[in-house]
Amino acid sequence: MTIIRKSHPLIKLVNHAFIDLPTPSNISGWWNFGSLLGVCLVIQISTGLFXSMHYTSDTLTAFSSVSHICRDVNYGWLIRYMHANGASLFFICLYFHIGRGIYYGSYLYMETWNIGIILLFMVMATAFMGYVLPWGQMSFWGATVITNLLSAIPYIGSDLVEWIWGGXSVDKATLTRFFAFHFIXPFIIAAMAMVHLLXLHETGSNNPLGIPSDADKIPFHPYYSFKDLLGIVSLLSFYLTIVLFFPDAMGDPDNYMPANPLNTPPHIKPEWYFLFAYAILRSIPNKLGGVMALVLSILVLAMFPFLHTSNQRGMMFRPISQAXYWXLVSDLFILTWIGGQPVEPPFIIIGQLASIFYFSIILILLPVAGXXENKLLKW
């Protein structure tokens, strides 16, 4: 008689994905972020579910319902701050996960990579809609500014914006539909994450050396299940430190003021995890050009498999590519800083230069570095 985990149709799926899965024996801590993203998603769905039980998606009561959650609901403050900071944690893990993929050449698994890019867009859209729900000043004005960008699309732009708003401005209809979409999207993200995993398990995991590892595979459980558990405990301790000691560190103080369509805040800016893209958007004086740069700043990830020129997969033994990679990471930090600054000198020119460097490193420097390293190694 076979073991139930190998014969039962449902348990067999779990077994192939998380128990008997053959895994490279040398994958490092950078491979932990996939499971951490799964944990983040579970945290966000569960805290969001409890927060939605007390939230009302009406312009008159949305702000006070969030206040009510924090003041009157048992542990409501904890649920609300776990959900708000969970989004930041989600993006920290996401950016590490993508950074690992770029560094070690994981983008050569094209199905997995492209599904990952779709997932990134979905998570960004969901986070943006969630930021609108508390109906504070930055929620309202962020929603107005970002949705208004669609009006830059020729011919259909202004109609499209009014269609999304459900009226002549961001109002009750907008808030209600954003709540509906914000609720459903994480479940779609969870389903897409399963597809992401399915595509990955067709090829098997990459590893730090970037070489085939069929000759040296070990079962996922117990080795990597416990390694993931260590990552999860570390993540949760960091997460709870933020939630319990610095709950407002990631947020904007303007969002503690109820939305007022008659009073524009002096600096409208999104949450910190969108600031790099916001800086790229603002670096182009033309509206349509800015919107295109904004979309391309994420979509450029899809170019990585086609721009891979090196005969080695990862950057582990490629110092020139490493230099360009870390310059890209530094550039993203600079863009994040600029995104939070007002549009005035010297920030304008810094943002424009950082945006040019961002695209130049990805589209020119990394492929050139790869080709140069091939030449140096006489490959």
Swiss-Prot record:
It is found in: Mitochondrion inner membrane. Binds 2 heme b groups non-covalently. A ubiquinone binds at residue 201. Its main location: mitochondrion. The keyword Transmembrane applies. Its cofactor is heme b. One of its GO terms (cellular component) is respiratory chain complex III. SUPFAM superfamilies: a domain/subunit of cytochrome bc1 complex (Ubiquinol-cytochrome c reductase), Transmembrane di-heme cytochromes. It is a multi-pass membrane protein. It holds the Pfam family Cytochrom_B_C. Heme b b562 binds at residues 83, 182. Heme b b566 binds at residues 97, 196. Coiled coil: none annotated. Keywords: Electron transport, Heme, Iron, Membrane, Metal-binding, Mitochondrion, Mitochondrion inner membrane, Respiratory chain, Transmembrane, Transmembrane helix, Transport, Ubiquinone. It comes from the Eukaryota. InterPro entries: Cyt_b/b6_C (IPR005798), Cyt_b/b6_C_sf (IPR036150), Cyt_b/b6_N (IPR005797), Cytb/b6-like_sf (IPR027387), Cytochrome_b (IPR030689), Cytochrome_b_C_euk/bac (IPR048260), Cytochrome_b_N_euk/bac (IPR048259), Di-haem_cyt_TM (IPR016174). GO terms for molecular function: metal ion binding; ubiquinol-cytochrome-c reductase activity. Heme 1 (or BL or b562) is low-potential and absorbs at about 562 nm, and heme 2 (or BH or b566) is high-potential and absorbs at about 566 nm. Belongs to the cytochrome b family. The cytochrome bc1 complex contains 11 subunits: 3 respiratory subunits (MT-CYB, CYC1 and UQCRFS1), 2 core proteins (UQCRC1 and UQCRC2) and 6 low-molecular weight proteins (UQCRH/QCR6, UQCRB/QCR7, UQCRQ/QCR8, UQCR10/QCR9, UQCR11/QCR10 and a cleavage product of UQCRFS1). This cytochrome bc1 complex then forms a dimer. Component of the ubiquinol-cytochrome c reductase complex (complex III or cytochrome b-c1 complex) that is part of the mitochondrial respiratory chain. The b-c1 complex mediates electron transfer from ubiquinol to cytochrome c. Contributes to the generation of a proton gradient across the mitochondrial membrane that is then used for ATP synthesis. This is Cytochrome b.
